[in-house]
């Protein structure tokens, strides 16, 4: 009897008979054929399978597609392999037992790991039920809605936009249905790969999003039928959400987390409940993470932060692979990849697609991929292809049959053109080739192509196949039940059956909590900055109110201190709105992946923030409470701290709720700023409750800060007697007056008492009652829980604003007629497309206008070294070459070879490092005008969003062409450039943003046009002009460069590995290897024969006939995945006769060119083409135009200048001249200053936008000087802010009634005009202050924080909250340097001076005179001395005294005099001028490259 093989208990079968094992093995062998096993011979990293791998009796060597359909979804990890032995190994418990199964081992084999895992799962199908998701679709029609015209909003027509929006809301506006996808049909079985081909705008992304269920802004026709092997579309995207994933081309991750932490989170969120027995969740997730990272070559990044554009982290390619790994770990059986190879070179793209192939083959998953510039090797990996043409389906079927289908139709595929390029070229009339004799038979329009497809026999077979496929998996059938059972087996205990999530809600919260603390650990800077900043602010505020005395003199100071304390505690969380918006795209992505509820992240984020909130609160409140000598008893301190912490948490919930209900950042920030102002005003300190007007008084009842402030005042004053510090009467002659004839000067005082009762004071002054203390706490808790629930609910339900589809935007009145017509007709392609332009301009040749270049640019022995971590690293190593007029030279190389570095060095754009070698123009050194006389087409398409295409070209031509060229001639040349680039139909279109503006190709053409408009006299540099473009657009760009070269332009162009056809456009090639070493420089020859012969003659393998020479060359030098170089090719080049010929030619060229007479020195050889004043005017004009076309900014500025002043005006409506009325008017002026930070923060982003464009593109091109830029940037703000002063003045000054104070002095007009001047100065100061702060700061958020800090200091030390006499001596300098000191002094004096005070009843002091005296004889001396007023001089009892007789006395108490108003005005103008000069100086100091600090050496 044969011994039974034993298996570890964790696999669910303690022992299994030999016959049972053989039965399993035979079943698997029936499922997997040898042919398919042979097809999968490589791991994702190009590792060859071991042909000597002999399988045991239970291993699965041959795998066919049918078998894969029957294997369970292993999408989290099933890209690995099994082992050689008959029994599987539990790699989760002990991965080190077999190095080939250990992802941390150098011997790890992903294929063996995969086979091992498959073996385990097939042994217990009941425990691990299978789950697959193919898809079929019939009559798929998708559409959106548009309007008859799309025009650019500006300040003038914004109202028309608003009316149109209102009409659409009311249903009065006719919406035009725009068809996007029309009559799509097809099916993809599980385990298959479908490639989606089409040009941008053809509907590729929409098709993928529809399959994946992301249909925001899209509508599906009622007849559309989509099902996923028995599961309906609706159910798949609700109950089974996350099983079909749309992978966008952008990478969105938390930058603070490491790659390992990011992927571990995804693995944990989808860790199934039906794991192998004995394997914990942590073990499972960690092992799966390690396997996938090893598979994708990410193991070395496990502890490296993801990073982003501001935080250093993994490279861009590694970040893209992290996104791919995250999708794999999500375990979805159907994946939609939207251009995920964008920006990758062809070898990296091939590696990515091979990974997908391995996953689908082993797991039975399904992949649908839209891909650009697919090489033949990539295309051949796919099973099926769908070709789209302007929203129509023109083919669906086997990838291997597509080429023959169209060739039989009458089209021709040139030699060496890939199948993918051939199929997409059919959608471009200028590129498709028709076989001879078929010219009248082939289709030409999208509708004709679609009709030919619908009439084809291939389509009839497809329909039959779809019917058979759907009959195999009817809705609700066996596959649906298997899918449901499989999904249920993975769900954790406590998860609802209809829930799409794998984890239960508490588990999701715990998982998000863990990630939240990791994020906090990864970036402690914000927490530390908050703690340090609040500590500093606590010390500053506490020093201002240091050690308050215990007498009635401290009443106002204590109230102001508690007001400041509660506001600082309440608004400590205001920036959480920004934090929420930074993470919102990530949370929404994970919700689509069904990793966790957004509300789970919301709850966890609040919990994660609690420790830092408590720490900040403890530090701030401890310092403030005890330094200022607030009520020093344990009970009262803890009451103070309890209310402070509670209001912090409550306001945090409110700010989070505002962020959650907003669908854009602007929607969140504008209401929050107005909301904060309302809370400040209606707290109860600036205007007491009894003085609030009824139309706004209700706001106090809805203000949680108001309840907290009342409780803090009660806590400080209740049950406490304060010794009187100032009696009435007092002073010389009143020393012997008995106490019975005196009264304390504070509210709530009683005659004859030497103290003031705290309860009486707060009752009289604020109507606060001690019984409200804990009632208020209960109300605050009510606010806390209400907004907590609201935040959680809204975070779950409200989604961010979806992006719009691609549309062109034109200035109003300049929309082309054909655009209007096409949109009325509901045509998706109504916007101009390149093919229409090509047809319209087929006979036009505008390149004749190009001035032929005559200079030769040549370089020899160019080296470039930089310092990296203290060590010198050579980036470029002795590069030789030249660019002659009329030639197109390609610069190629492997990733990291230094292509862009060489381009930057040659273009003189490098600002650090050491450069050696010769770079000459006609044998002479480059002069100051070199950068201006060269065109540099950057890889990034950077343009001002508000400019039109023509305006961008005119700007470049005006500033960069010589000043001697007439302006009319420059404009005429711009028109020629527009024709040359075939941009006539969108020349008036606004650049805009992607999706609402120019598309990718149009932007690239504009980038080229901007450089051509400068009429470069020397040469043009092109940096990756085809990166990220589809093959047809790349072809059009290359043909354009060829055309330019043919007309005399000299062009040097870096390019990622292009197709063979693209390479034929180039004359010469400079190829670099790793380390910046030359591999080849020379002619390409016809069909690249010269290049091929060079490598073949040097010992390389022969180039196959149909191979792409560019890819073959990479394989030869060992740069392609899985390839190895058999010799040192840079060394081969250095020793070759070809290099010797290059060196000889350089020597000859230098000698001959030096014999030419040097050009005469003229103004055209200066750094800039135009004088400074002309640069300034042109820049200023463009900036004014930008502001005019940014109505959201201007109207936000207007709203900030109108709504808060108007609200303040009606809050302090016609304030009387009582003591409280004067204080209210003073606070009305104080509150007007609160709009300052809002205006500042609005301005900064627009400056940063202009500066980024200038520094990245226009400064290196020497278009204009930084002085012109700074002066224009500062000046452009001033008119708008001056304009805003008008509504701010009228909305604030007159409602408050400040003009009435001028009646007694008969100076209403004069003081009204002075007040307007002061508001004007305030607005000008705000503008210039903003420019000064942001001039040298990188990010507007950082600038906003600095401005907020300086604003807070100015607010504290302006003399309102604390008078100069009350300030400690060492803070007097802050009072004197604060600009708000002089602004508040001027505004208060102009607004209040020169009128009498009329005390209200509660402000009148009732003093009993001594017996035998009337009030006049008793108090006349006192009121004259104190500048008060005696109201009843003849009375003999109850003398009524108003402590202040006129407003001048009131102002004198805060050191303000009306006579200083013009001095203050002059000082404010000094501050404005200082801001301007400081902005210019700071920009020069921080951001202008200094020649002496560039550390560049040219020898």
Curated annotation (Swiss-Prot):
SUPFAM superfamilies: P-loop containing nucleoside triphosphate hydrolases (SSF52540)
Biased segments, Polar residues type: 16-30, 80-94
Transmembrane domains' residue ranges: 526-546, 561-581, 606-626, 635-655, 669-689, 778-798, 1193-1213, 1227-1247, 1268-1288, 1317-1337, 1353-1373, 1466-1486
Example GO BP: xenobiotic detoxification by transmembrane export across the plasma membrane
Activity regulation: The efflux inhibitor FK506 impairs the transport activity.
Role noted for this protein: Pleiotropic ABC efflux transporter that confers resistance to structurally and functionally unrelated compounds including azoles such as itraconazole, posaconazole, and voriconazole.
Protein name: ABC multidrug transporter A-2
Organism: Aspergillus fumigatus (strain ATCC MYA-4609 / CBS 101355 / FGSC A1100 / Af293) (Neosartorya fumigata)
Encoding gene (name): abcA
């Amino acid at each position: 009897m044969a011994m039974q093989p034993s298996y570890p208990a964790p696999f669910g079968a303690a022992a299994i008979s030999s016959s049972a094992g053989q039965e399993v093995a035979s079943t698997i062998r029936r499922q997997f054929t040898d042919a398919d096993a042979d097809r999968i011979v490589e791991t994702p990293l190009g590792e060859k399978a071991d042909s000597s791998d002999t399988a045991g009796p239970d291993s699965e060597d041959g795998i066919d597609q049918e078998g894969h359909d029957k294997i369970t979804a292993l999408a989290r990890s099933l890209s690995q392999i099994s082992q050689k032995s008959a029994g599987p190994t539990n790699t989760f418990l002990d991965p080190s037992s077999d190095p080939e199964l250990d992802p941390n081992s150098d011997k790890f084999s992903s294929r063996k790991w995969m086979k091992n895992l498959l073996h385990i799962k097939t042994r217990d199908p009941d425990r691990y039920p299978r789950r697959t998701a193919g898809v079929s679709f019939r009559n798929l029609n998708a559409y959106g809605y548009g309007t008859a015209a799309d025009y650019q909003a500006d300040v003038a027509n914004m109202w028309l936009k608003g009316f149109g929006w209102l009409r659409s809301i009311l249903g009065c506006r006719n919406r035009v249905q725009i068809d996007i996808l029309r009559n799509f049909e097809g099916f993809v079985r599980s385990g298959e790969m479908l490639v989606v081909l089409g040009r941008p705008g053809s509907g590729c992304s929409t098709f993928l999003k529809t399959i994946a269920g992301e249909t925001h802004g899209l509508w599906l026709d009622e007849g559309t039928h989509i099902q996923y092997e028995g599961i309906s579309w609706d159910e798949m995207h609700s109950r089974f959400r996350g099983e079909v994933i749309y992978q966008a081309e952008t990478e969105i991750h938390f930058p603070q987390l490491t790659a390992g932490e990011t992927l571990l989170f995804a693995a944990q969120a989808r860790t199934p409940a039906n794991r192998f027995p004995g394997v914990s969740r942590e073990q499972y997730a960690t092992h799966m993470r390690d396997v996938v990272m090893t598979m994708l070559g990410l193991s070395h990044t496990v502890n490296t932060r993801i990073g982003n554009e501001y935080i250093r982290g993994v490279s861009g390619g590694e970040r893209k692979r992290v996104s791919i790994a995250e999708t794999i770990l999500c375990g979805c059986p159907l994946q939609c990849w939207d251009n995920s190879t964008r920006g990758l070179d062809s070898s990296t793209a091939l590696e990515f697609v091979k990974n997908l192939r391995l996953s689908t083959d082993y797991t039975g998953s399904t992949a649908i991929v839209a891909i650009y510039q697919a090489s033949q090797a990539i295309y051949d990996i796919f099973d099926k292809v769908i070709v789209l043409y302007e929203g129509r389906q023109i083919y669906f079927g086997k990838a291997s049959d597509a080429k023959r289908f169209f060739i039989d139709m009458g089209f021709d595929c040139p030699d060496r053109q890939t199948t993918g390029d051939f199929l997409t070229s059919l959608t471009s009339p200028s590129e498709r080739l028709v076989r001879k004799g078929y010219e009248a038979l082939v289709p030409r329009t999208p509708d004709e192509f679609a009709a030919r497809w619908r009439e084809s026999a291939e389509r009839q077979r497809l329909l039959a196949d779809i019917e058979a496929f759907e009959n195999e998996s009817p809705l609700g059938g066996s596959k649906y039940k298997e899918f449901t059972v499989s999904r249920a087996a993975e769900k954790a205990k406590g998860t609802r059956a209809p829930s799409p999530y794998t984890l239960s809600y508490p588990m999701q919260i715990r998982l998000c909590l863990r990630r939240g603390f990791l994020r906090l650990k990864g970036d402690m800077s914000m927490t530390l900055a908050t703690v340090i900043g609040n500590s500093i602010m606590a010390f500053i505020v506490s020093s201002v109110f240091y050690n308050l005395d215990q007498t009635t003199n401290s009443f106002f100071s204590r109230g102001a201190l508690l007001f400041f304390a509660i506001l600082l505690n309440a608004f400590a969380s205001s920036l959480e709105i920004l934090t929420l918006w930074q993470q919102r795209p990530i949370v929404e992505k994970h919700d689509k992946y069904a990793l966790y509820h957004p509300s789970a992240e919301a709850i966890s984020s609040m919990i994660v923030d609690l420790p830092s909130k408590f720490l900040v609160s403890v530090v701030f409140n401890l310092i403030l409470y005890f330094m200022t000598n607030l009520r020093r008893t344990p009970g009262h301190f803890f009451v103070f701290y309890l209310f402070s912490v509670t209001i912090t948490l409550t306001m945090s919930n409110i700010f989070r709720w505002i962020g959650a209900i907003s669908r854009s950042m602007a929607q969140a920030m504008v209401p929050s700023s107005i909301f904060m102002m309302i809370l400040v005003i209606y707290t109860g300190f600036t205007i007491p409750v009894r003085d609030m007007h009824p139309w706004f008084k209700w706001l106090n009842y809805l203000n949680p800060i108001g309840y907290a402030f009342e409780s803090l005042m009660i806590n400080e004053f209740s049950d406490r007697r304060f010794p009187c510090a100032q009696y009435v009467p007092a002073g010389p002659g009143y020393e012997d007056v008995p106490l019975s004839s005196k009264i304390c000067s504070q509210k709530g005082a009683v005659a004859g008492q030497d103290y003031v009762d705290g309860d009486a004071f707060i009752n009289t002054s604020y109507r606060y009652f001690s019984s409200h203390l804990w009632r208020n706490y209960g109300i605050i808790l009510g606010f806390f829980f209400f907004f907590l629930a609201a935040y959680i609910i809204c975070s779950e339900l409200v989604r961010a604003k979806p992006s719009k589809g691609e549309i062109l935007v034109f200035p109003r009145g300049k929309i082309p007629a054909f655009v209007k017509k096409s949109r009325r007709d509901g045509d998706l392609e109504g916007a101009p497309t390149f093919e229409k332009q090509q047809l319209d301009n087929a006979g036009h040749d505008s390149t004749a206008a190009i001035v032929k270049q005559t200079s030769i640019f040549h370089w020899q022995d160019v080296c470039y070294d930089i310092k990296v971590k203290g060590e010198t690293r050579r980036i470029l190593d002795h590069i030789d070459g030249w660019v002659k007029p009329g030639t197109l030279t390609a610069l190629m190389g492997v990733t990291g070879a230094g292509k862009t570095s060489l381009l930057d060095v040659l273009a003189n754009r490098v600002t650090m490092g050491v450069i050696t070698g010769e770079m000459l123009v006609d044998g002479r050194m480059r002069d100051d005008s070199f950068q201006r006389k060269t065109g540099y087409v950057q890889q990034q398409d950077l343009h001002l969003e508000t400019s039109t295409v023509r305006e961008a070209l005119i700007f470049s031509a005006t500033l960069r062409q010589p000043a001697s060229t007439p302006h009319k001639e420059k404009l005429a040349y711009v028109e020629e450039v527009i024709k040359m680039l075939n941009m006539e139909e969108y020349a008036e279109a606004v650049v805009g943003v992607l999706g609402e503006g120019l598309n990718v190709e149009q932007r690239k053409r504009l980038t080229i046009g901007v450089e051509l408009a400068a009429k470069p006299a020397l040469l043009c540099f092109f940096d990756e002009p085809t990166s990220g473009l589809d093959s047809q657009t790349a072809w059009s760009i290359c043909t354009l460069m060829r055309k330019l070269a043919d007309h005399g332009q000299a062009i040097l162009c870096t390019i990622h590995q292009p197709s063979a056809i693209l390479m034929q456009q180039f004359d010469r090639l400079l190829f670099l290897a790793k380390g910046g070493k030359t591999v080849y420089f020379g002619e390409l020859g016809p069909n690249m024969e010269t290049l091929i012969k060079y490598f073949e003659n040097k010992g390389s393998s022969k180039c196959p006939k149909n191979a792409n020479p560019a890819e073959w060359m990479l394989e030869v030098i060992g740069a392609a995945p899985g390839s190895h170089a058999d010799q040192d090719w840079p060394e081969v080049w250095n020793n070759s006769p070809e290099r010797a010929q290059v060196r000889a030619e350089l020597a000859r060229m230098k000698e001959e060119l030096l014999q030419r007479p040097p050009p005469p020195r003229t103004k055209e050889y200066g750094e800039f083409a135009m004088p400074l004043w002309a640069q300034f005017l042109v820049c200023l004009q463009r900036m004014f135009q930008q502001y005019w076309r940014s109505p959201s900014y201007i109207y936000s500025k207007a709203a900030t200048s109108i709504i808060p002043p108007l609200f303040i005006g009606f809050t302090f409506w016609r304030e009387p001249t009582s003591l409280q009325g004067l204080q209210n008017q003073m606070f009305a002026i104080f509150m007007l200053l609160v709009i300052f930070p809002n205006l500042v923060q609005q301005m900064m982003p627009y400056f940063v936008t202009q500066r980024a464009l200038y520094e990245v593109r226009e400064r290196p091109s020497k278009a204009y000087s930084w002085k012109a830029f700074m002066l224009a940037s500062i000046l452009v703000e001033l008119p708008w802010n001056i304009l805003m002063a008008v509504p701010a003045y009228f909305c604030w000054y007159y409602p408050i009634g400040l003009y009435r104070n001028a009646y007694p002095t008969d100076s209403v007009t004069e003081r009204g005009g002075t007040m307007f001047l002061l508001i004007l100065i305030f607005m000008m100061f705000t503008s210039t202050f903003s420019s000064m702060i942001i001039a040298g700061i990188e990010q507007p958020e950082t600038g906003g924080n600095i401005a907020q800090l300086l604003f807070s200091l100015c607010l504290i030390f302006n003399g309102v909250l604390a008078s100069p006499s009350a300030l400690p001596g060492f803070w007097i300098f802050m009072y004197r340097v604060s600009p708000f000191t002089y602004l508040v002094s001027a505004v208060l004096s102009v607004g209040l001076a020169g009128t009498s005070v009329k005390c209200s009843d509660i402000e009148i002091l009732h003093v009993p005179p001594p017996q035998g005296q009337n009030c006049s004889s008793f108090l006349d001396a006192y009121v004259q001395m104190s500048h008060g007023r005696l109201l009843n001089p003849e009375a003999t009892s109850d003398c009524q005294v108003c402590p202040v007789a006129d407003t001048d006395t009131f102002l004198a108490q805060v050191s303000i005099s009306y006579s200083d108003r013009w001095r203050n005005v002059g000082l404010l103008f000094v501050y404005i001028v200082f801001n301007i000069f400081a902005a210019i100086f700071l920009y020069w100091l921080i951001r202008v490259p200094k020649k002496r600090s560039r550390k560049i050496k040219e020898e």
